[in-house]
Amino acid sequence: MPMIEVTTTEIVDREAAIAIKKALGGNISIFPGKPESRVMVVIRGETPIFFGGEEGPAALISVALFGEQPDETYDKYARVAVEAIVKALPTIDKSRIYVKYQTLTHKAWGKDFA
């Protein structure tokens, strides 16, 4: 299950959260074998972030994926993710959005332990 976490300094209302979820979750299929039906998206707003030592509107997008992915998919997804944040939260400049990826070697679903 891909896990996407968005942390931002801004207030995220329901409309913005849904737009971000649709864009980031809906485009997870950029990564082979990663359908939207298997993605979890967490969005946190109003979190202090210091980017380059400066406080101000910013966002961190963390994407955790099981297994290595083709190199070109990381940049392609980052472009989609940055565009989605700028569109949903226009107070954030794209130069203040950081996208990080984590490759997972193990996975566990709650249902696996029932």
Where are these regions (language model features)?
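Interaction-mediating elements
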Residues: 1-114
